Amino acid sequence: MADAATTADALRTDAGTDHSVLWRRLHSLSGVLPLGVFLCYHVFENLSALRGPAAYDEMVAHVNTLLPRGFFYLLELVTIVLPLAYHALYGVWVAVSGRPNVGRYAYAGNWGYLTQRISGGIALLFLLVHVGTLRTWVTLLGNHLAPVPVPADGLDLVTYRDVAAHLGNPASLGVQSIIAGDHIFALYVIGTLCTIWHFTYGLKGFCWTWGLAVGRLAQRRVTVVAWLLFVVLSVATLSILFQMRFGALG
């Protein structure tokens, strides 16, 4: 009966807020395709940091030669910026208009809903700092956070030393500021874990919403896969962050 009451509450909430099925499905889809796929790729490419500054800088330079500059920016706008903006704005609206009921029904699904909303807010704050600093302040505006050689082609790219300075690595010779230091490292640790959790937990909802996991057995399997993905991405990301924060730059 408690499950039925929870479902009834959910139905009443949905009926009273005029949520569009289409917008909810697009929100779910955008969180996985393309944003979730890009997250996995971004973690994978940044694993080069574990091999040192030269390998990381070489990876960044290689990625930026794969496509013409104009097409690269267009692809970034269409596949990352716009989906992220929609997913974030709609997610904020859902978080503000929703009414978590963990106080009345302390089921795993209700707690999952609450943690999904909280992790999404923290992830959004982290992404604003991450993109605003490394993509905009450094790459687009050319304001490096640590001493770097002047690029021969005039194209400013984020370097290993930039990221190390951003995270507060003293060996980077970067200056402690509001966008660089130990507080940023703490934000990155918390923010990346929240981002990964938000994605992997949302992956379950995506599979259920789109009918990819029908039945309890399929849903349990998806849950196991989501947890494994969370662990793998978290270990990889924390390894990268700790390497760039505490590792040598020589």
Question: Where does each model-flagged region fall?
Answer:
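Membrane-embedded alpha-helical bundles that constitute the cytochrome b-like, heme-associated redox core
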Residues: 1-250
